[in-house]
A protein has these predicted regions:
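Glycan-recognition and catalytic cores of secretory/periplasmic carbohydrate-active enzymes
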Residues: 1-108
């Protein structure tokens, strides 16, 4: 029978282990790109499909799972930064999701 050895090295020096790394990723790398390219300025709704160079492609249908992910991201960005623009977009997304994402026929 072989023995399995588990070892945890000291990872305190790794940047991925610190909250500032993830906050900076969200607020400086991820959210600015989505705010600049991922939202249709006419409707303030997220594009459903984007090409690798951030050009809208495909359908314009809004899917609850997609909207839920955006709502989570916007809410997290607001909690991390306190910036009102994230809160405003989160509220807009939540309202749209509640209004259009509810299945009145089956109650969910």
């Amino acid at each position: 029978m072989r023995k399995v050895k588990a070892d945890c090295s000291d990872s305190t020096g790794r940047k991925e282990m610190h909250g500032a790394f993830w906050r900076d990723q969200a607020l400086h790398d991820i959210m600015p790109a989505w705010l600049a390219h991922g939202i249709n300025p006419a409707s303030e709704r997220f594009y459903t499909g984007l090409s690798r160079d951030w050009k809208p492609i495909g359908t314009t249908d809004q899917y609850p799972t997609m909207l839920g992910r955006h709502l989570f991201s916007l809410s997290a960005a607001y909690l991390l930064s306190g910036e009102e623009r994230y809160l405003r977009l989160a509220k807009t997304t939540a309202s749209y999701l509640i209004e259009h994402g509810w299945d009145h026929e089956f109650g969910g």
